[in-house]
């Protein structure tokens, strides 16, 4: 094989490697965005009133997670 043929094959190999690397980064970014959206939704679902916040603060709990059966639900961490 001539030197020109080897150079062309090498160039094609490098181009294919570079494009596959870029595609992988795009997939990772999409997955990362999907995870961030899930986290944001779980945080914004809870409905908190000032009365609930004060109730939890008086009982040495950190966070009001919302109402459960009409009663304030307090916890250190809120899930969902």
From Swiss-Prot:
Locations listed in the record: Secreted
Chief localization: secreted
Keywords: Amidation, Cleavage on pair of basic residues, Disulfide bond, Knottin, Neurotoxin, Secreted, Signal, Toxin
Gene Ontology molecular-function annotations: ion channel inhibitor activity; toxin activity
Modified residues (Phenylalanine amide): 79
Propeptide: 21-44
Cystine pairs: 52-65, 56-74, 64-78
Recorded GO CC terms: extracellular region
Tissue: Expressed by the venom duct.
Signal sequence annotation: 1-20
Family per similarity comment: Belongs to the conotoxin O3 superfamily.
Domain notes: The presence of a 'disulfide through disulfide knot' structurally defines this protein as a knottin. The cysteine framework is VI/VII (C-C-CC-C-C).
Record protein name field: Conotoxin VnMSGL-0121
Lineage, opening ranks: Eukaryota, Metazoa, Spiralia, Lophotrochozoa, Mollusca
């Amino acid at each position: 094989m001539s030197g020109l043929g080897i150079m062309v094959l090498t160039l094609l190999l490098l181009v294919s490697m570079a494009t596959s690397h870029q595609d992988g980064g795009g997939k990772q970014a999409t997955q990362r965005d999907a995870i961030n959206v899930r986290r944001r939704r779980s945080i914004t679902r809870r409905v908190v009133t000032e009365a609930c916040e004060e109730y939890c603060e008086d009982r040495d709990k950190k966070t009001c997670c919302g109402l459960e059966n009409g009663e304030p639900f307090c916890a250190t961490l809120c899930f969902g």
